Amino acid sequence: AVIENVPVFPGCDKGNNENKRQCMSEKIAKFVQRKFNTELAGDLGLSGRQRINVIFKIDKTGSVIGVRARAPHPRLEKEAQRVINLLPKMKPGKQRGKAVIVPYSLPIIFQVQD
């Protein structure tokens, strides 16, 4: 489903929906890079490229809810959930002028340094 007004990450107010979506993806990626403990994978004996799929929703108030993660190890899933739950409050997505819940999925990919 296409949403009329996408959720807006802080600092991503400019441009159309596509610009805002792109800005949000970049900001979330940077946020995750800063906060995610990538050494955890090495400590767990994992090596090479790791991929964690994260699904969450941005609710009608702009808060992150319902964070779920799939990863090669349960501790990586927990870490991904921890980091996504730290995301700042956003402007909620809107449909016909009303705030709506918007699902969001995000891959977290990183390389384990040996």
Predicted feature locations:
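Charge-biased low-complexity segments
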Residues: 1-114
